[in-house]
C-alpha cells in the first residue's frame, strides 16, 4: 500500500505519524476545554466550563481552558488562554468598528464581514483561533473538549489529539422556534442568516470522536437533527454548584412570590406564556412575579407586560450577583421554568438546589430533570400554567414539600462531581477509539 503523504495545514505537517497512541490506564488525564463564550455568571456556556473544569481538577485531572469573551477567572491551577479577538458582542461596545490594523487579520476580517451581514460568526472564528493557539501545544493534551463551538477548526485539532464536543441541544430547535414566531419574510431571512452556522456544526459533529450531551432527550434530538448515531453519544447530565445554590435558613418565603430567571425575548424561553398566566392568576388572587434580569427596551417582553396591564404584579431585578440570585430563591414560594424546550434545564436544577418548589413545562428534557420533585404542565399552555401556579399559591405547604423533594433529588443526581466522572468516561472512550 502506498503511504499517504502528509498534509500541510498552516505550517503543520499532518499525517498518521502525528496521531499519538495514548495509553491512559488510570493516570490523570491532560484536558483542554474550549468555549467560544464564557460568562461564568450568566449564560450556560460559562457556567458549564467553570464548574466542569473545577470538578475535573477535583478528580485529579490536569485542565487548561481556551476561552472566548468575556473570559473566565478560574481557581489557581487551571490556566486560561484567551486568544485575541474582536469581541464584537461586548455590551459595553456593541458592534464596534474595528481598526484597519485589526482587519488585516483574515479571521478578524471574516468575522467583521459576517456580523455586518447579520451572521453569527463567533463559533467559526473561535475554532480557527483555538487551532492557531493550540498548534504548538498538542503534545500537552490527552483530549480536547469543545463546548458546542463545533467549528471547522476542530477538524484540524482532531488530526493531532482525540477531540470530543458537548452539544447541550441541537440549535436547529432554537432556529425553528424563532422561524415559527417570525412575522415577516424579512424577519425569517434574518433568522436563517443568523443561524447559518448550523450547517458547519452538523458536518463537524459527525466527524468528532465522541459527542457528550446532557440528557437522554437531548441525545434523541441530536440523533434526529444532526444525524449522529446514538452509540457515539454519551449522556453526562449537568451539575449544580451546591455550595452556592443551597437553602438559606432564616429567610421567610413570601407565599405570594413567584420567580423566573429568564427575562429574554427569545421565544424558546417561553416567558410570554408565563406573563399571560400571571394575568389570569392576578385577576383572582394576590401574586408577585419577580423576573431576574431586565427586558430589552421596547422588546416583546416589555410590550407584552404593558399590553396585559400587569405592571403592578411584575418586577424586573436587573443584573444580580449569584448570591443575590440565591436570596431571591430563598424568598420565593416557587420558581417557574416556562421554556418551550430545554436540552437540560439548569434553572430548574438551581431552584431545586435552593429548596424552592419548581413549576416547569414538559419542554425537552425538563420532565427528565424535574422528575416527581415539581409540577409539570404542557409547554406553551398559559392556562395550564396559571392553574398550576394558583394551586401552589392556595396550598403553600405543598410547595414547601416539593422544595424539600427537589433538594434531595439534586444531591442524588446533579452534582458537578457526578458530571465530571461521566465526562471522563467519554474522554476515555474517545481516546480508545482514536485512530
PLM features: residue spans?
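Nucleotide-activated donor-binding/catalytic signature segment of Leloir-type glycosyltransferases, i.e.
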Residues: 300-323
Amino acid at each position: 500500500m502506498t503511504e499517504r503523504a502528509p498534509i500541510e495545514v498552516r505550517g503543520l505537517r499532518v499525517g498518521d505519524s502525528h496521531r499519538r497512541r495514548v495509553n491512559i490506564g488510570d493516570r490523570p488525564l491532560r484536558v483542554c476545554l474550549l468555549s467560544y463564550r464564557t460568562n461564568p455568571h450568566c449564560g450556560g456556556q460559562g457556567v458549564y466550563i467553570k464548574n466542569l473544569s473545577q470538578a475535573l481538577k477535583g478528580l485529579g485531572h490536569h485542565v487548561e481552558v481556551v476561552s472566548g469573551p468575556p473570559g473566565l477567572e478560574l481557581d489557581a491551577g487551571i490556566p486560561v488562554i484567551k486568544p485575541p479577538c474582536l469581541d464584537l458582542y461586548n455590551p459595553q461596545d456593541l458592534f464596534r468598528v474595528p481598526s484597519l490594523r485589526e482587519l488585516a487579520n483574515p479571521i478578524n476580517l471574516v468575522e467583521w464581514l459576517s456580523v455586518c451581514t447579520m451572521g453569527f460568526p463567533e463559533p467559526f472564528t473561535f475554532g480557527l483561533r483555538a487551532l492557531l493557539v493550540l498548534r504548538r501545544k498538542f503534545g500537552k493534551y490527552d483530549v480536547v473538549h469543545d463546548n458546542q463551538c463545533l467549528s471547522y477548526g476542530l477538524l484540524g485539532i482532531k488530526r493531532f489529539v482525540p477531540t470530543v464536543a458537548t452539544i447541550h441541544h441541537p440549535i436547529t430547535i432554537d432556529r425553528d422556534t424563532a422561524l415559527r414566531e417570525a412575522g415577516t419574510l424579512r424577519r425569517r431571512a434574518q433568522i436563517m442568516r443568523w443561524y447559518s452556522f448550523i450547517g458547519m456544526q452538523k458536518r463537524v459533529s459527525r466527524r468528532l470522536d465522541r459527542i457528550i450531551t446532557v440528557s437522554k432527550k437531548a441525545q434523541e434530538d441530536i440523533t434526529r437533527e444532526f444525524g449522529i448515531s446514538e452509540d457515539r453519544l454519551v449522556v453526562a447530565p449537568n451539575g449544580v454548584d451546591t455550595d452556592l445554590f443551597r437553602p438559606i435558613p432564616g429567610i421567610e418565603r413570601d407565599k405570594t412570590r413567584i420567580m423566573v430567571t429568564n427575562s429574554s425575548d427569545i421565544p424558546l424561553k417561553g416567558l410570554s406564556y408565563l406573563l399571560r398566566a400571571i394575568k389570569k392568576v392576578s385577576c383572582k388572587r394576590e401574586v408577585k412575579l419577580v423576573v431576574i434580569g431586565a427586558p430589552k427596551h421596547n422588546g416583546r417582553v416589555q410590550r407584552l407586560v404593558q399590553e396585559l396591564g400587569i405592571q403592578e404584579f411584575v418586577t424586573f431585578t436587573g443584573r444580580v450577583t449569584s448570591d443575590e440570585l440565591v436570596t431571591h430563591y430563598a424568598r420565593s414560594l416557587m420558581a417557574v421554568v416556562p421554556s418551550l424546550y430545554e436540552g437540560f434545564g439548569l434553572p430548574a436544577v438551581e431552584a431545586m438546589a435552593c429548596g424552592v418548589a419548581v413549576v416547569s413545562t414538559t419542554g425537552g428534557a425538563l420532565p427528565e430533570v424535574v422528575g416527581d420533585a415539581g409540577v409539570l404542565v404542557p409547554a406553551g399552555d398559559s392556562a395550564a400554567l396559571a392553574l398550576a401556579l394558583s394551586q401552589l399559591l392556595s396550598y403553600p405547604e405543598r410547595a414547601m414539600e416539593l422544595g424539600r423533594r427537589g433538594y434531595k433529588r439534586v444531591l442524588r443526581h446533579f452534582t458537578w462531581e457526578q458530571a465530571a466522572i461521566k465526562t471522563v468516561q467519554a474522554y476515555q472512550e474517545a481516546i480508545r477509539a482514536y485512530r
